[in-house]
Amino acid sequence: MKNCLIAHWYTPPYIIDLVDLAAGSKTDPALLKVMEDFYLKIGKKPVVFEKFISGYVANRLQAAMGLEINKLLDEGWATPSAIDDSVKYGLALRMALMGSLMKADFTGLDMMQRGMANRTYDPPIPKGNSSTLDELLESGRGGVMSGAGYFDYGGLSASELFKTRDIGLLRLKSE
């Protein structure tokens, strides 16, 4: 279909700028350009893919992190707070400024290659469910909408928590 493409937004879409655009094999290239220009005009950051990638890039990276995070929790190697602090005060701060590949350029690609060759651990292999997630869900801790997940949200309503998140994201975007 020449007038068909995928536009995939991220949550919350009224704050997060990334929009994945993926054309079908028969999509008119002019349509892809029109949509890219449209998203730029409304302040979004469209990322155009030559073809559909199952899960898109950001979701695939997030899924890989999720596997590692749940492995750390399942094995009792780290707490939710330690993991989130490692992300917020290290990984995410650098990635927000440079992304992943530019950060690698700053580290040095030779060092990156040596790190890959001499890795002291193996990334987790998807094996189904996480025992940590199973326990949380069985105890009614499904995340913000249920009042608790990895963290306890102290009786705050979901709308209060989403508002706090949104204000924080807007503050980060404005700096």
What residues fall within each predicted segment?
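Rossmann-fold dinucleotide-binding core
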Residues: 1-51, 55-59
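A general alpha-helix detector
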Residues: 17-18, 65-69, 111-118
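NAD(P)-dependent Rossmann-like dehydrogenase/reductase catalytic/cofactor-binding core
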Residues: 33, 40-51, 75, 80-175
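Short secondary-structure transition/capping segments
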Residues: 59-61, 156-157
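Flexible helical/loop "lid" subdomain adjacent to adenine-nucleotide binding pockets
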Residues: 61-77
